[in-house]
Regions:
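N-terminal amphipathic/basic leader segments beginning at the initiator methionine
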Residues: 1-40
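Electropositive phosphate-/nucleotide-binding environments in soluble metabolic enzymes
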Residues: 16-20, 24, 39, 56-64, ...
Length: 180
């Protein structure tokens, strides 16, 4: 176990110099008091959520749960939004962007006063992206899988997350239904 003075975040907040004075004043500017986080591990929550990614629609609530857990464990949580890779709507393919997410994850963890990370993900490319970035940074991290994508409903029937599109596309092509 490391001491409070050994925390990586103390490089930003600990020294009695101009730069750290500036860091502390900016955090106060955000409405935080130094006692809320000084001496506690600052835990970055890498959250690849956006409103276009159906894999992660439940992440806003999950982030709140993670924050509560970090606080209860004695840490200080900060959410760090990251590139969201939703296979369903991104063109031409999310594979092109997976390495961007890895680089962004690494740089978010490197450039901010972060002592450890909670990595969130769920889609095919999000999971390896956040893991590769955190591994490159070599900080204590834990991965929280998003779980299954929320399913939809249509005409009273529960739809699968991706398989029903093929069934209903065949029905549409056969002239048995329209898009309404």
């Amino acid at each position: 176990k490391i001491t409070a003075d050994e925390l990586r975040s103390m490089r930003w907040f600990g020294p009695d110099d101009l730069r750290s004075f500036g860091h502390r004043s900016r955090v106060k500017q955000m409405g935080l008091h130094l006692d809320e986080f000084k001496g506690r591990p600052v835990i970055g929550i890498i959250n690849p959520w956006n409103e276009m990614n159906t894999c992660h629609t439940h992440f806003p609530q999950r982030v709140q749960d993670i924050k509560r857990g970090i606080l209860e464990a004695g840490g200080f949580p900060v959410e760090l939004p990251a590139l969201s890779l939703g296979e369903q709507l991104m063109k031409p393919t999310t594979m092109m962007y997976r390495n961007f997410l890895a680089m962004e994850t690494e740089e978010l963890l490197r450039s901010y006063p972060i002592d450890g990370a909670v990595l969130m993900g769920g889609c095919d490319k999000t999971t390896p992206g956040v893991l590769m970035g955190a591994i490159s940074m070599n900080l204590p991290s834990i991965y929280v899988p998003g779980g299954a994508m929320l399913r939809g409903n249509w005409r009273g029937e529960t739809l699968g997350s991706g398989t029903d599109v093929w069934k209903y596309w065949a029905e549409r092509r056969a002239g048995n239904l329209d898009e309404n």
